[in-house]
Amino acid sequence: MREEQKGAVKNSIGRIFITALLILIQVVWLIELFIRLNKYSTGISLVSSAIALIVVIKIYGRDMNSAMKMPWMILIMAFPVAGVGIYLLCGHSGVNIGIRKHFQALQSELTPLLPDKEDILQKMSDEDRQTANMAHYISHSAGYPVYDNTDLEFYPEAVDGFEAQKEALKQAKKFIFMEYHAIEDAQSFAGMKSILFEKAKEGVEVRLIYDDVGSMGFINTDFVKQMESQGIQCRIFNKIVPFVNMFMNNRDHRKITVIDGQVGFTGGYNLADEYFNITHPYGLWKDNGVRMEGDAVRSLTVMFLEMWNAIKKTDTDYTAYFPEITYTAKQTGYVQPYADNPLDDEHTGENVYMNVLNSAREYAYFITPYLLISDEMKKAFTLAARRGVDVRIITPGIPDKKFVYKATRSYYNRLVKKGVRIFEYTPGFCHAKQCVSDDKAAVVGTINLDYRSLYHHFENAAAFYHKDAVAGVKADFDHLFEECHEVTEQYRSHRSTALRIGQCILRLFAPLL
């Protein structure tokens, strides 16, 4: 197994190097071409400047977060040719028209398979308008209904969720769907892989999706062949190619498992050793997961099938994947799985978090590996705190990306000055993404408090209301606060001019990180 891991790393380093080198050559060649043309032709120089100005005006007029516009406008004005090229590569979602239409067609095909749960929304409204409004937004703006008749268990430790997941996989009778940002063909996945192989031999349909960038360095290029040789259908989302690719900035960050359309898992952990503290690259790794059983799993099934067919359209009849559920839940309360798509204009992940803050009356607690947020999100945090809500955010004590960590800390001062309390997870790196408010509502999923998750990636989460698991999330936060170091006062103090300027620059370009 160790030799396989070394081979995977070596293979991935080679792929990354060759791909980056070829893309760099293309970009440098284009820039050099324009520079030379500008040098020898005043007309071309004027044309390139005019194009840069038009692009800046177009960016300014786009219906997007203002914090996303500013760094692009500055970059293009400072370096017209290179700036426009980088923007078209990484920042211009409009170039993905074909991909956007493909996803829209799939959504039109699959959305009718989601049930109309207006009666449940009305029931929630009669019981508690505060949580009903949150559920109403997800249902009517994102298109994912809220369900009752669903049992949900929260796992504050990723390893517990992983073990429960393996036990559930052993019970599969018809199909298994799995979609993950990162898979590492190492110790943690070995046990799960043997279960999947055995299930495939039994005739269970097994499908697996992983993101190419997320899994790079973790698996060999022959991983798909290995899976398919054992009867497992395997697809790679958004393969990295050595050519300028305008879609490569959008990654599949989701974590979904569906078993027979009745049992589902999601949360923060990927299928790699570091998530279960088998390895410790950044101290103790904090992550989480949820297990759901019942009606709400239907939404996870739709999410997976959308991504599966987005990679390659093969399904024409979805009937077999939506069996009639005869399960009767033991718990009361409501569950609402939902997804976020960077190709539409509805920033569901960000809006759900802001709704949690805007509706909170007593407290709102968040944990995130990165804190790179828009002015709108920052305002939601500070307004809640100024209303007297106990607002707290937990970030890592040991970072996985030092530059991003510096950018994360650059947001502390403005938040703590308005009453938000900041805690750093002393034992290591917190990869969990969860929030809870007022003992009524909680969200657990894949969505970080950063621009990549909120604007660029395909994400998913589960909101749940008036469930026992809400108390479980709250208890997890209470335990985490004991393990954390509060840095509120430290970052409330006066900062030097040099530090303030540096942090302003970090925040300015945070949307590009």
Per-region residue spans from a language model:
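Catalytic-core elements of nucleic-acid end-processing and repair enzymes
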Residues: 433
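Helical hairpin unit composed of two closely spaced alpha helices linked by a short loop
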Residues: 370-391, 396, 401
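N-terminal localization/anchoring segments of enzymes in phospholipid and broader phosphate metabolism
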Residues: 1-351, 355, 359, 399, ...
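Thr-Gly-centered strand-to-loop micro-motif
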Residues: 340, 367-368, 395, 425, ...
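Short, solvent-exposed amphipathic alpha-helical segments in soluble enzyme
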Residues: 380-384, 410, 478-479
